[in-house]
A protein has these predicted regions:
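Alpha-helical transmembrane segments in multipass membrane proteins, preferentially the mid-helix core
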Residues: 117-135
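Membrane-interface transmembrane-helix boundary segments in multi-pass integral membrane proteins
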Residues: 32, 160-201
């Protein structure tokens, strides 16, 4: 199973490098939740792949924290998929355009890779192929929320103080009250995703 996990994580690395590598303004990686979570997933899958190769060659045990990082990355990717489907998909507020990528790379392909392919691959690998790597320390249920909490707190502070041009318009005064309140579904969904994934791991 570990070989399947290795292959799946290498595919994730290739998909992430291909997509994030074609972003025109690399500083935008710090602006969008999708880019940040996928960049984190890229790093984690790369680390996982290296550790898996070392394990397969030397027989060393893969430490628990490696699967803990995979848990964090998988929850983050699933949260981006949920956010995209609920708030940004179906022609609602898709902000990734051709201007965001180098010539010849389709934003449609970027959306498919970042919001569907990588999250699903990560989920399949975590639940099916990585089970032999035990994870039991409950601290990961707290660590998993750190990247998202940092992003969304920073996002709301910068948006409400008009310190940047808000990428998603979630906090815009032009939005209806319901639209703003509905953003609360994002942390709620993250709690549900992380809780469910932890209990079926």
């Amino acid at each position: 199973m570990l070989i399947k996990a290795l292959i799946t994580n290498l595919v994730i690395v290739i998909c992430e490098v291909l997509t994030l590598g074609h972003i025109r303004g690399k500083r935008n990686i710090l602006k969008y939740y999708t880019y940040l979570q996928n960049f984190l997933a890229l790093i984690v899958s790369l680390v996982f792949s290296v550790c898996s190769i070392v394990y397969l060659v030397s027989g060393r045990i893969i430490p628990e924290y490696i699967r803990g990082l995979r848990y964090v990355a998988t929850c983050g990717l699933l949260a981006t998929m949920f956010t995209f489907i609920v708030f940004l998909g179906a022609g609602k507020k898709i902000v990734i355009t051709e201007d965001d990528f180098l010539f010849g790379f389709s934003p449609v392909m970027a959306n498919i890779i970042l919001h569907y392919i990588c999250p699903i691959l990560s989920l399949v690998s975590f639940l099916l192929f990585e089970r032999e790597i035990k994870i039991s320390n409950g601290i990961w249920t707290a660590i998993v929320a750190i990247p998202s909490c940092i992003y969304w707190i920073t996002y709301m502070v910068l948006s409400l103080t008009n310190a940047w041009e808000e990428p998603y318009n979630f906090a815009s005064k032009a939005n209806k009250i319901w639209d703003v309140l509905s953003v609360l579904l994002i942390p709620l969904s993250f709690i549900v995703i992380s809780y469910t994934l932890w209990n079926v791991k």
